[in-house]
Every structure is written in structure tokens, then in C-alpha cells.
Curated annotation (Swiss-Prot):
Protein name: Probable septum site-determining protein MinC
Organism from which the protein derives: Blochmanniella floridana
Classification of source organism: Bacteria, Pseudomonadati, Pseudomonadota, Gammaproteobacteria, Enterobacterales
Taxonomic superkingdom: Bacteria
Keyword tRNA-binding among UniProt keywords: no
Pfam families to which the protein is assigned, alphabetical: MinC_C, MinC_N
NCBIfam families (UniProt xref): minC
Role of this protein: Cell division inhibitor that blocks the formation of polar Z ring septums. Rapidly oscillates between the poles of the cell to destabilize FtsZ filaments that have formed before they mature into polar Z rings. Prevents FtsZ polymerization.
Residue stretches in coiled coil: none
Family: Belongs to the MinC family.
Length: 238
């Protein structure tokens, strides 16, 4: 008689936002976080999971105040990263929160803009993406599309609150208001092409920008994203 299996252990990849503070002033942190949430209401919701980068936190009182401030906003703290203070690490560990390594979390870099369409060069080996998935219908709020081991072409709109993911490149011939994640399996040579840009999030190979990090002159326009030296680069498409 075969035994029934009640539990499976599965590996998976999840996108986590990291909050890094550059001040211990909780009122300022609360004000800026609240504004970011207001600017991207479909991306954030009650209990949105986040990781806190505590690299700039050295005193346990600052940690407790920061934890309380972020929790009161409605975000759900699932762990911390970049904890190099041994005393603080012990306090956080005893509270039950895991301390994550940088490899577990999604990364963010400053805006970089290039106006000329020059082909980028990369040091990493190219991941083999041999197929393409094409979608001709709108991607509605709440929908999630994942093109595993292939490129993704969407000939329609991506609504706010929707998420489109591909291990390869992503082409969107329509309005983009949701989340777009290319190179989901780690391929940093993946690119994103959009004809009408206004996304909640853009990510390639784990490096991402939120809407308010995208230079305003690109919003509503056609644009191309790619990575160069682990930095996101955006260009106009004429």
C-alpha cells in the first residue's frame, strides 16, 4: 500500500522589496514610505512582504523604532539583510526574524540613462532562450504571466496590478501599468521593450526600479531597458 504524501518541499523564486533607510528619523521614514505607497497603490497592499536593510542601524533602540514604524504603515517584515552589528544581529535573531543574504533578495540600483541606442556588451555567459510566448489579449489586474525559459511578447496592454515575467526578453506593444520582470532566472542579458511606459515596477535579472525611480521624461513613451555592469539602463526608442 502506497503511503500518502501530505507535505511537499519545493524550491521557488519570490520577488522581495528591500527597504534601506539612510536616517534614523522615523517621522521622515514614515512620510517618505507613505508617499511611495501612495504613488504605487496597486503594487503595495496590506501586509506586503518586505525585507529591511539594517546596514545603517547600529543601536537596538533605532531598530525597534524602525520596525514599529514600518509595521504601522501596513508592511509585513519577513526578514532583514546586511546586518553586520553582532549585538543587533543577536537581538533580531532572538525576535524570530531571519537574517537573509543578498542572494535571497531582489536588488535596486540608481537610474542610468542613455539616449543613443548602442548595443551593450556583457561579461556573463548567455543563457539559452530558444522559444517565444506570444499573448494577444490584455493582461488584467491580478493576472500573473510567466514565460519560463523563453521570451515573452504581449501585443496588448498590461494593467495596473498585473505582473508579467519571463526568463528571457519581454516585448510589450501596448500600455504598461503593471509589473514587468525579465531575466527572472538570473539572465542579466535579458532586455525589456515597451511602447507606452508607466509601470509599477521594471526588473531585469533581479535589479529593479519602482515607478518613481524611472526618469519622468520616459513615462508614457517607448523605451528599452537593459543591464550593463549590474546597472539598469533606459533608452528612448524612436
Amino acid at each position: 500500500m502506497l503511503e500518502s504524501v501530505s507535505v511537499d518541499l519545493q524550491g521557488n523564486n519570490f520577488t522581495l522589496l528591500v527597504i534601506q533607510t539612510h536616517t534614523t528619523c522615523t517621522s521622515q521614514i514614515q512620510l517618505e514610505l507613505t508617499q511611495k505607497i501612495k504613488n504605487s497603490p496597486s503594487f503595495f497592499s496590506n501586509n506586503t512582504p518586505v525585507v529591511i536593510n539594517v546596514e545603517n542601524i547600529n543601536h537596538h533602540d533605532d531598530w525597534f523604532n524602525l520596525y514599529q514604524t514600518i509595521s504601522n504603515i501596513g508592511l509585513f517584515i519577513i526578514g532583514v539583510c546586511c546586518c553586520y552589528n553582532k549585538k543587533l544581529k543577536n537581538i533580531i535573531t532572538q525576535s524570530g526574524l531571519p537574517i537573509l543574504t543578498k542572494g535571497n533578495i531582489i536588488k535596486s540600483h540608481k537610474n542610468t540613462i542613455k539616449t543613443n541606442y548602442t548595443k551593450p556588451t556583457f561579461d556573463d555567459k548567455t543563457n539559452a532562450i530558444s522559444k517565444t510566448q506570444t499573448i494577444h489579449t490584455p493582461i488584467r489586474s491580478g493576472q500573473r504571466i510567466y514565460a519560463r525559459n523563453r521570451d515573452l511578447i504581449i501585443i496588448s496592454n498590461v494593467s495596473s496590478g498585473a505582473e508579467v515575467i519571463a526568463d528571457g526578453n519581454i516585448h510589450i506593444y501596448g500600455s504598461v501599468r503593471g509589473r514587468v520582470l525579465a531575466g527572472a532566472s538570473g539572465c542579466e542579458q535579458s532586455q525589456i521593450f515597451c511602447t507606452k511606459l508607466s509601470p509599477e515596477l521594471i526588473s531585469i535579472g533581479g535589479y529593479y526600479w519602482l515607478n518613481d525611480q524611472i526618469p519622468p521624461e520616459f513615462l508614457g513613451k517607448s523605451a528599452r531597458f537593459y543591464l550593463q555592469n549590474h546597472t539598469l539602463i533606459i533608452q528612448h526608442i524612436s
